[in-house]
């Protein structure tokens, strides 16, 4: 069993100003999945991304927008989202909203922000 506490995990800023904390990772002994906690504020710059792995996202607080191609959905606390491998996507907060969510990805993904 692995246990972590959000307040004890180092916060890292992505190049676009998102704040991420790696709650569970391969380095901690999780062989198949990793869990990240994201915070997006008005200081963050939205950027479209696509990765060869799937994402599962659970919205904790605030409201935001998730865009994929021509589809744009408003999301809020309690929503769960699946993003397929290689699906272009953009996640952003609504103005003046602190937006937090969990993102679950397969363990060992290559191009990730970690320090």
Report residues per predicted region:
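A short, N-terminal "cap"/entry segment at the start of jelly-roll beta-barrel domains
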Residues: 1-32, 113-115
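Short, conserved beta-strand element in jelly-roll/cupin
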Residues: 39-40, 51-66, 104
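Structural motif
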Residues: 56, 63-65, 72, 88, ...
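Ligand-binding loop in jelly-roll beta-barrel domains
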Residues: 85-111
């Amino acid at each position: 069993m692995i246990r972590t506490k959000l307040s004890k995990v180092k916060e890292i800023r992505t190049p676009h100003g998102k704040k991420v904390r790696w709650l569970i990772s391969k380095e901690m002994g999780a062989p198949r999945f990793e869990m990240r906690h994201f915070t997006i504020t008005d200081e963050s710059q939205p950027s479209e991304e696509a990765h060869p792995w799937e994402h599962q996202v659970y919205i904790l607080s605030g409201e935001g927008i998730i865009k994929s191609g021509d589809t744009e959905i408003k999301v809020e606390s309690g929503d769960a989202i699946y993003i397929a491998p290689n699906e272009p996507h953009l996640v952003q907060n609504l103005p003046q909203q602190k937006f937090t969510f969990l993102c679950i990805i397969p363990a060992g993904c290559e191009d990730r922000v970690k320090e």
